[in-house]
Amino acid sequence: GEPLLNPEIGDYITAIHKIFPYTRIIIVTNGLLLLSIKAPLIQIIKEDRVHISISDYTCLDRDKIITFVQEHSLSAELREGKECFSKYLNPQGNSDEKEIFPQCIRRNCTFLAKGKMAACCQPFVAHFFNEYFHETLPENEGIDLYESGLDGWEIQKRLITPMRTCRYCSKDVSFDWATSKMPYSKDDWCVK
């Protein structure tokens, strides 16, 4: 989801920077809320050297965003619009996670949600797919950040280890990007 919707994003940034002081933190945003972030969050972003990656959607006022970024001396980029989309889900759950994980382009985009961390978004967004398509992909898998004795080394080890969720992914299959219209099709998400 959109990270700037999270009222505790500043706390997350501070905690991650404290645990992993040399890790590059990137906020990937659609840009719609960027101009409304308040001074305390801007200060945290600057102090912890957070980079902001902004989707360059046509509805955004590029000039205002560029001015905002420059006025606040933020590290940011405007990413080009989408030309293709990839489907990768395998609802049968019969993929070999040890084969899929090393090829996964999402495995290096660490996500935080509800006190958990995972190498990708899938454990935290599967419920949307499950609800709409009446499927049972695993939900809420991830590293419990409140686990007793958990340290940065253990987190790092688990982030590079395939999850059970990986069995429900496949190799990416790209297709031309277009706005989806209801009713949505499983074929837009599933390879098998």
What spans do the regions from the language model cover?
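Hydrophobic "anchor" residues
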Residues: 117-118
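Short loop/turn microsegments at loop-to-beta-strand junctions
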Residues: 105-108
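C-terminal accessory region of radical SAM enzymes
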Residues: 70-81, 122-176
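Radical SAM enzyme core and accessory elements
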Residues: 169-192
